[in-house]
Amino acid sequence: MTATTAASSGDVDYRPSYGAAAIAATLVLVLYIATLAPSTAMWDTSEYLAAAFTLGLPHPPGNPFFVLLGRFFSILPIAPNVAMRINILAALCSAVSAGMWFLIAERVLAGWLPRRWQRIAGGALAALIGSTAFTVWAQSVVNEKVYTVSLVGMAIVSWLTVRWCDDPEGPKADRLLILIAYLSGLGYANHMAGFLALPAVFVAVVVIRPRTFLRWKLVLAGLLAIVLGMTPFLAQPIRSAYFPRINEGETTGCVTKIAVGCTFSDLTYQRFMYNFNRTQYGKPAVTDRQIPFTAQIGMWWTYFRWQWLRDANGTHAAAQEVLAWIFLLLGLLGGWVHWQRDRRSFWFFGPLIFTVTLLLIYYMNFKYGYSQSPELGDAVPREVRDRDYFYLWSFSAWSVWVALGLFNVWERIAQMFGSDSVRMGADTVEVPRQSSWMAASPLLLLAVIPLFANWTAASRHGQTDTRDFAHDLLESVEPYGVLITVGDNDTFPLWYAQEVEGIRPDVTVLCTSLLNTDWYTRQLIRNPIRPYDLADGPLAYAGSTWPQPTKAPINLTYTQSDSVPPAVALDANQDLKTASGYTFTVHPRELDGGFHGLERADLFVLYIIRDAFPSTPVYFSRTDGSYPDEMGFGNYLVTTGLARKLVAVPPTASATMVHLPSEGWFDIGTTYSLWTKTFDAPKSLARRDGWVDRPSVGIPYVYIRTGAVLAEALVQVGRAADAQKVMATTERVAKGTGLTDLLAAQQQQ
């Protein structure tokens, strides 16, 4: 019996079970709170936590609606700290999404099931499966970015569209469409995924009530609603002109303070549109495929396999593959059941699934995934990290079809144990007896598998290691020092530590990948140096006076900064003479295309050394790899904790300073003091149960390397007992993160 037939009989109760959906969403929220991160995490988490707390601008296009929403949650007294409050926002969004999938699954099941408890059971299956899919769960317990807010927007729009499909001629139909348009525009102000549901809405309207598009007033109202929803973007040029510490893209033409003239200027418009269109990323056209489309589908399949059993260590590959096929086939069966039983809502939900799977895969046009096809190694272009979060919407929405498919199989098996004829409206249908449903219910254990299979990998409970790493790296730098970093994971956590928790704001953090932009270098000149709190500083730097600098560490005007070229050619070594009279020999670097020279970022690093060194301490994060060595500073670097300090004259060996073949000059005294009295991460890393995210494994590895090298240095100066203590801590870190192989490799060097 189709939904149309059922709907024609007035005895069928189609009222949504909002109470049951609310209970399901609440239970999902409880699960997420139980596994919630107490702090920040790797990648973009710290950037967005800090941007929300400071009402700043994260990377383009700036996600203004999320920033406003995140700021609101950051001041709500619902958790002990800012990070947890914004993480709760992510958990709440995903829990509400689960409630929406519950309602949609229940609505489809209402087309052929007479008893409400049966429909509620189907809705519960959708909520459970969707909320425990690995990527959904992992994104819901720590606010890595904006994806859970986008998810709840898409889920709400989906439910509203299903309601519209039920009564497209009703008195609320037009208002529903305008509300859908507004929420889509508001969703776009959070992330471009806000428009993901619109193609499916369009298809549903074309099929069910095509004359809607002939009503120009309604169409115009819908377009205006979308534009109105996007108005949070208007806040960007205004907020940017107040120059918050996180001001990526700097969407203002103002230089020193906000004013009407510079706010409403061509320069502001150009910078705003450059930011809005994400021009700086230079992504190739969709028609210019980075890899074959089949390989991109393979990337999605890799991440789809993760959803039902996140086998980070590859120890359950066969079980993961079997589960993936089961959940894929159940979803396809559910789609077929949806088509057969409720054609109207299918005309929305079917195109939605197509949009968030095949169409999204084609549009995103990714390279090979970081973890995809490892046998190909570096012979193929790869993303710098796994992009499973971009398919969060597909894995979450897929749960509705999986629930429908699983329920259909459950019903078929239950009918084998006996059924009864039941009146449903004007029709009579065969429905399994209650005892038959119970007899077949063990099948539903399939829906519980992701809950238990993903708990360890998805849970962030008690994880503070990212925050602790940021604390430790900042504390490795002397007061008022400049710390040079290279990318997301050694930069964004520092922003969080400084802007949210107030840890070592005196340190000037310079990210080389951002130094290639004009707005970042203007902020380097503009931002004042903040004071050092001696009482909160590490013991390694106690007993000395540290005068606060009165000017930026670089002697350039805004105009001079903007005029620095993207790169300069340099065929041979060249001397760099500092303002204090010291001379360094700078080496050209091999850049893309075999070009030898220096990038804009390299030039700014040299300008800082030229203008501020040695009165301003200069450090390179040890996550920078060989970057400072490539520049020619290798003999002038001393390892100090998690950083390498630039010195004016190569040191000499002593009881606290040794030269190690694998590390270079090593400051035993300062590093030992930091390791034993200041660092927080060794304890939190030792508590881990593995390190799931392989692309960021360099962060725990820097502790393994530091501990191993420190122990080696201590042995070299006759401090064997201290070396054993350090090595014991290092071994606990390696065991907790599952990186004992890296420790063994380090010890063999």
Located regions from the model:
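Extracytoplasmic catalytic/substrate-binding loops of multi-pass membrane glycan-assembly enzymes
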Residues: 36-48, 58-70, 264-265, 461-465
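Transmembrane-helix motifs of polytopic, lipid-linked glycan transferases
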Residues: 88-116, 156-160, 329-334
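Short helix- or helix-capping micro-motifs
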Residues: 123-131, 184, 188
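N-terminal membrane topogenic signal
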Residues: 9-23
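ER/secretory pathway lumenal C-terminal domains and tails of membrane proteins involved
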Residues: 2-4, 107-112, 141-151, 163-180, ...
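Loop-to-helix entry region of an early transmembrane alpha helix in multi-pass inner-membrane enzymes
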Residues: 64, 76-99, 103, 120, ...
